[in-house]
């Protein structure tokens, strides 16, 4: 989520100023995050005016400002257009390639399975099945209870 009363730059600065001391380091990191997440063009825009994809990129950029080892992304592919979905998937792949652990919860099973190493299908509050994406897709119980036969 983002601070709704702040613009894009202020949202990221709010996190950076808590973790970094030097102004030049803060500015350098801010510029890198804006660039890496493709949101330089909206840096002065109020966070409430962002599209779904822009907001999602800002949320992840804010998270990265804290230099985490792991991130939890709650429905990162929800409510965004197909182009933005691909952008977010690429960003998630980039996080993974930079050795940042990523835990995703999302109902967009098809897109999510394309970017994860392992998946857990939860049905009625319990783990129905866990495994690699191809194991999930080919599991008869997962097909019957969650994916449907035409997945």
Predicted segments — roles?
Residues 71-75:
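Catalytic Walker B motif of ABC-type/P-loop ATPase nucleotide-binding domains
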Residues 13, 24-42, 93, 141:
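Conserved ABC ATPase "signature" region
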Residues 60:
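Hydrophobic anchor residue at the start of the ABC signature
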Residues 67:
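Conserved catalytic motifs of ABC-family nucleotide-binding domains
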Residues 46-50, 54:
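Conserved ABC ATPase signature
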């Amino acid at each position: 989520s983002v601070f709704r009363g702040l613009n894009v730059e202020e949202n990221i600065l709010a996190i950076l100023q808590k973790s970094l001391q030097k102004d030049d380091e803060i500015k350098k990191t801010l510029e890198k995050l804006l660039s890496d997440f493709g949101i330089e063009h909206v840096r002065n825009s109020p966070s409430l005016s962002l599209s779904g994809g822009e907001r999602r990129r800002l949320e992840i950029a804010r998270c990265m400002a804290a230099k985490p080892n792991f991130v939890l992304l709650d429905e990162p592919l929800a409510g965004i257009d197909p182009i933005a979905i691909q952008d977010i998937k690429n960003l998630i792949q980039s996080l993974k390639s930079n050795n940042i652990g990523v835990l995703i919860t999302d109902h967009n099973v098809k897109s999510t399975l394309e970017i994860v190493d392992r998946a857990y299908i939860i049905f009625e509050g319990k783990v129905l099945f866990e495994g690699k994406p191809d194991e999930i897709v080919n599991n008869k119980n997962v097909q019957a209870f969650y994916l449907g036969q035409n997945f």
